[in-house]
Amino acid sequence: MRKKQGRLTIVKQTEVARDSYELVLEGELVKHMSQPGQFLHVRVDESEDLLLRRPISIANIDPEKEQVTMIYRAGGAGTKRLAAQRVGTEVDVLGPLGQGFPLEEAKRGEEVLLVGGGIGVPPLYYLGRRLVENGARVTSVLGFASQADVFYEQPFKQLGNVHIATADGSYGAPGFVTDVISQQSLDFDVLYSCGPTPMLKALTARYRERRAFISLEERMGCGVGACFACVCHVENGQAHEYRKICTDGPVFPVGEVVL
Ligand SMILES: Cc1cc2nc3c(=O)[nH]c(=O)nc-3n(C[C@H](O)[C@H](O)[C@H](O)COP(=O)(O)OP(=O)(O)OC[C@H]3O[C@@H](n4cnc5c(N)ncnc54)[C@H](O)[C@@H]3O)c2cc1C
Ligand code: FES
């Protein structure tokens, strides 16, 4: 597939939780974006010291306005630089990249469980919107470190039932998303998840035999299949069998790759 790259203009940049920003970009490149779970590779600014792009998931798309929303945590040098960019600034974006969540796996009327942790929550919002449009019934379980980190509870509530968990117990249920799933006896036809590796490992251990899909947000370099920084091994595969998270993923069927 031909690489897509363009300059998008910042039309909104708001802090939605502690050190977490909702960034809305506008421009022609957005017309190529439609698959939930794909990501954009963002050049945070034009300075020489931050040449490496940062991968950030698509959290929402408004095709009519040609706007894409991302939600990111400003944790390191690059994302902090991005958070300092103001409305009206142009940002260099490569994408959409990767293989997103398979929407067709959830049929009309089926129960879908969205399980997100921290910066893994954003791509599940656009996924949930598309699933609801397709007639699936969506329940979301969203985990955060603390109350100050919680974002997008209301938008998710518009899609269906929402359960929030915080690790320190300051909001919602105390503990992890997996605790909530057990306590509430939540079941599903299809599960989609994105979040930290320990969470994805726990879900894989439980739901290996189920219709479940996980998105990996851990390792990335070039974003386009050229550098091998994102390689992961296939479960029970030969030593030479691998997948590239950037081009084969970031979404994989549960149990396909070694976490
Ligand atoms: C497919 C994908 C989707 C993602 N979606 C989101 C999202 O929607 N919201 C969000 O907040 N974060 C997301 N991330 C994580 C985000 O890319 C990292 O938090 C970010 O790159 C860290 O950059 P930094 O400038 O804060 O840190 P720095 O420490 O300055 O980063 C240094 C280098 O390491 C890389 N790096 C560091 N941590 C990560 C990481 N966890 N994943 C990938 N590369 C990393 C950076 O890209 C950069 O090249 C996603 C990651 C991937 C792979
Ligand atoms: S990030 Fe370079 S090959 Fe995947």
Swiss-Prot record:
UniProt pathway annotation: Pyrimidine metabolism; UMP biosynthesis via de novo pathway; orotate from (S)-dihydroorotate (NAD(+) route): step 1/1
Protein name: Dihydroorotate dehydrogenase B (NAD(+)), electron transfer subunit
Cofactor descriptive note: Binds 1 [2Fe-2S] cluster per subunit. Binds 1 FAD per subunit.
Cofactor: [2Fe-2S] cluster; FAD
Subunit structure: Heterotetramer of 2 PyrK and 2 PyrD type B subunits.
All residue ranges annotated as the FAD-binding FR-type domain in the record: 3-103
Naturally occurring in which organism (per UniProt): Shouchella clausii (strain KSM-K16)
Family statement: Belongs to the PyrK family.
Lineage start: Bacteria, Bacillati, Bacillota, Bacilli, Bacillales
Keywords annotated in UniProt: 2Fe-2S, Electron transport, FAD, Flavoprotein, Iron, Iron-sulfur, Metal-binding, Pyrimidine biosynthesis, Transport
HAMAP family from the UniProt entry: DHODB_Fe_S_bind
A Pfam entry, by short name: FAD_binding_6
